[in-house]
Amino acid sequence: MGKFSKALDKSSASSGKAAGSESLAESDKTGGSRSASVKTMDQEAAIGAGSSTSAGWDLRLRLSTDPNSRYFENFRRLRGSILYPSSTPKSRTILVTSVAPGEGKGFICANLGAALSQDVEHHALMLDCDFRHPTLARLFGISNETGLVDYLQDDVDLSYLMRKTGQPKLSLIPSGQPPENPSELILSNRMAALFKELAERYPDRLVLVDSPPYTVASETNILAKHLDGVILVIRHGVSKKEHVKKFVDILGRDKIVGLVYNGFPPNSLGELLDKQKGYGYNYYY
């Protein structure tokens, strides 16, 4: 059984005292050296084992994931196209990325993770691979002191790094502190082996990977090749058409399982959704 499998088993069997959002926020500000991070693993594991609630979530995330929210209905539609594709095999490992910074890919990834975990047959695991500018831990009110960087760089066991988010069936492995060599870690054999194990075990688990934007990090292209599919976030008024086209051409259209149009004016979005019903791609806030 691989390390990822053991980590999931330990995470599922764990129980403990919930960590408050205030203490989590403080721990995220403290920083600290790499060695200090590893020495406090027992404290981090206690945070991960807790049955925390969504009280520590970013307010925008709490509002957008409200089951009665009109925004969340959009993510239900995207969830449906992922779980029940019309003409291609179901993608179980998915990269969420954008072509440029500031397009909202981290926020989209968090919302999609929440939507996927509400399906009765699936669990969702999120990995924050944007080592330069991580966002997922902050959105969920979770410490980012340790994470995937420690697994790749210091051989820390995944069971210490997997965090509960406060929503059943939704877990997160944060990025950890920004490393000096993000590209080398992403492209390492250890990362490739992790993705292989993610793909081969636990068929009820869907994996979402938040990656650096395409125009910022060249390793995003390589990262995409390890995963089943890609969701590309395109922000209204920000994304450049030529960059989007180039990225899609590099990956191949079959690799794209969804396009998320973020930041559309409400009236424009409504008109677009009406026109695109039944089409293979998805369009959201």
Language-model regions: role of each:
Residues 2-75, 185, 242-285:
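C-terminal lobe/tail of nucleotide-utilizing enzymes
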Residues 50-76, 80, 87, 99-102, ...:
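P-loop/Walker-type NTP enzyme "switch/lid" segment
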Residues 90-94:
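Pre-Walker A (Motif I) flank of P-loop NTPase domains
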Residues 95-97, 174-175, 208-210, 232-235, ...:
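Conserved beta-strand segments of the P-loop GTPase G domain that flank and frequently precede/overlap
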Residues 105:
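Conserved lysine of the Walker
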Residues 108:
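Hydrophobic positions on the alpha1 helix immediately C-terminal to the Walker A/P-loop
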Residues 111, 115, 138-139:
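Active-site signature of alpha/beta-hydrolase-fold catalytic machinery across serine-
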Residues 213-216, 227-244:
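Conserved Switch II/interswitch segment of TRAFAC-class P-loop GTPases
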